[in-house]
Amino acid sequence: MSLRDKAYSDLMRELWGSPDIWNTKKSYIEIAAKLGVDEETVRNRVKHLRDVGFLLGYRVVPNPTLLGRVFASLRIEFRDRESKQAAIPRLAQMDGVINIGSAYDTSLLVTVLADQDQDFPKLIVGLGVDGEVSLVPGLGLRTTSFRMTKLDWEIVRLLLRDAERKLNEIAKQLKVSTRTVKRRLNMMMKEGAIFTMPVVDLRKTEGISYQLRVQIEQGKKLEVEKSVVAKIGNVVFRASDSENGSVFGFTGANVAEGSDILEWVKQQPGVKSGSMTIAERVVQVFDWIESEVERRPKTMPVREPSPERKMQETIGIRR
């Protein structure tokens, strides 16, 4: 079965369909019930995604609010593909960058945990990157008021590159119980303090990975989204990038299919504009986020034990 089949697009949508469910833990039983199949079928399809090299794993990203930053997406247009490729390692050294998406043209889409008033064009020039920078409406990630503990940051640090590490291994390394690690992780997920993002190899999609952006007239969004999803059929990803903007990700068989869908979308009532990009690959970046998370526990003040705790310890010593 090809990854272009609706069975796989439906599965991927349930696993990681949009940023608002990145922090939602779903069991195979729940996914199976939603898709109308049995649990073993879901398990086998996920295994196939891994076996063909498409699903490489998952990474953890802390909510940018906890770092005093905001989620931002930059589109950088270059004069040619050569200058684009040369810019990727330089952009990977920029503070806040967590991944770099390359399209089959002369553009890059850079995901950044950015300072609130960041001057991106100036920052890019400072890196020696010659490209035209524009800010793409971000895919909304909810903020959080969760208060991270030192242990929380230590747990996150160990999951940044591999969100599927065994909890007992983490517990052993941090010298706490597995139950404690599980409890803290569940709490962080529930409060939106961390997000689990899929890591995929787009070259193994057995098709073309499209991203369709649509700007919609006021009050027509739900209607347009419904018709676009019905037209595409195998939507993997759907999200809002602004009040009247929507993004759809899907895998097509060829370039002609993508062109036909784009032309159809532009002609629909309520659609103001539409654009389509073909994703080539995604470069995962860890340097900045690892250093940022690693320093967090070191800068946290050591809390004095409460009077009650001191009394308990004193009594314990006397006994």
Tell me what each language-model feature is:
Residues M1-R319:
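A compositional/biophysical signature of low hydrophobicity enriched in polar/charged and small residues
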